[in-house]
Amino acid sequence: MSRAGRQLALLLCSCCVAVAIPGGLAEEGCPAEPHQASRYVAAVYEHQSFLSPDPLALTSREQALELMHRNLDVYEQQVTTAARKGAQIIVFPEDGIHGFNFTRTSIYPFLDFMPSPRSVRWNPCLEPHRFNDTEVLQRLSCMAMKGEMFLVANLGTKQPCHSSDPGCPSDGRYQFNTNVVFSSNGTLVDRYRKHNLYFEAAFDTPLEVDHTVFDTPFAGKFGVFTCFDILFFDPAVRLLQDSEVKHVVYPTAWMNQLPLLAAIQIQRGFAIAFVINLLAANIHHPSLGMTGSGIHTPLKSFWHHSMDSPEGHLIIAEVARNPPGLISAGNATGKTDPFHRKFLQLLAGDPYSEKDAQDVHCDAAPKSTTNASPTFNSEMMYDNFTLVPVWGRDGHVHVCAHGLCCHLLYQRPTVSQELYALGVFDGLHTVHGTYYVQVCALVKCGGLGFDTCGQEITEAMGMFEFHLWGNFSTSYIFPMLLTSGMMLETPDQLGWESDQYFLKKRGLSSGLVTAALYGRLYERD
């Protein structure tokens, strides 16, 4: 069984947000995890990149290099800062050097030639004239060597091909969205060519999936993938079937989409589900909805999300070489907790528990002509969700669609003048990508009308203590907890209980925006 599907767990730590300090550096805003000998220092940089004023226009290699060197100058400054803080690895975002929205032709001057690191051992900084059109690789190599750290960056690359190659494009070359990895001495260690392209006409999909893993002296094996890849089995999940891969470097250019797929939501959920450290570097263009980076462990996150700041942001954190595992759900069921005991009784089909749970206090809730909450449909994430309103101070509600039934057992210290709803979706998502999902989600609606449920919101006042669960038919389930002001929260407990996957949370730090269990059925894509 995958690590995502193992029995889960009581999470003992809270999330932490990276905070800015003078000089542009960001450090964790709460105490570090207990010190262990086997730890390393990681850095990710969210980059406000310099972009081509007209990415569709044809330009020269010299003009392209002028733009890219401006971005590389910023990278070099961040490597210097990270080195002073003891960073052993740094990750930069997707598209951070060259930008985006090119055509296949207009991006050509921005591409470096890319030899295969598996067949050619090369240090671009020390051997700059070995291959033509490698100026970007040379600078990145020199940064890694000067900073004495592993460096991961994303750039466009080209690879000539012959007409005898049945996959060779008509212009005689492959163009790839490529991550490169340099060791601390500047050697090109490996590359990853993006497999799941997201409307990227400038690039080709590799004929075979790269399953890129590189080894480090300070933390063992790291996997590599890019942006949209995180939603698919290949290469992301297949990489993690290697039990020795406990860390992932993840350049991304992610456009946030609430309520379920903000960058930090999926990053955090992925780290928890697979019990790994995820080093995620996003591009920073708030006007395009692009922000959200972090160093995520199974128990804690150091992250940055800002729609206001025009500046890039460096995050540095010390994390464990062996990410702390999750405590067995069987050892942490909290049977002495009356609220959790009621949840277990509901799973067991205790009719008295069901009666008690549905005894909803409706003093501040809309009146209904029936005892059951009305179901309704609303668009969320371009999908047709079936939902029920969550009214009153406490209760148990459930909603089903196509065999997936989602349940919510909840208590509220006070009832805010906001509408919340429990939603379910079990089907093929077909907008901006095609993939099969099973989702149970408690969301704050954009207004008081049912048709506002699923809208993008970031602020909320509603406080909850709850169990959220469903009869998922996949073991790949990503837990998501987001509160007011784009703050990440950690579940108190989550796991399998009586063939139901559940998430438990008490003591939110601020109003709930989204609590979700986001399941992927890769085989049904």
From Swiss-Prot:
GO terms under cellular component: extracellular region
Signal sequence, renumbered to the chain: 1-26
Keyword Nucleotide-binding attributed: no
Active-site residue list: E94 (proton acceptor), K194 (proton donor), C227 (nucleophile)
GO molecular function, one term: biotinidase activity
Residues modified by glycosylation: N132, N185, N384
Major site of localization recorded for this protein: secreted
Cell location: Secreted, Extracellular space
Gene Ontology biological process terms from the UniProt entry: biotin metabolic process
Uppermost EC category: hydrolase
Highest taxon listed in the record's lineage: Eukaryota
SUPFAM superfamilies in UniProt: Carbon-nitrogen hydrolase
Protein keywords: Glycoprotein, Hydrolase, Secreted, Signal
PROSITE patterns linked to this entry: CN_HYDROLASE
Catalyzed chemical reaction(s): biocytin + H2O = biotin + L-lysine; biotin amide + H2O = biotin + NH4(+)
Function of the protein: Catalytic release of biotin from biocytin, the product of biotin-dependent carboxylases degradation.
Similarity comment text for this entry: Belongs to the carbon-nitrogen hydrolase superfamily. BTD/VNN family.
Protein name as annotated: Biotinidase
Annotated organism of origin: Bos taurus (Bovine)
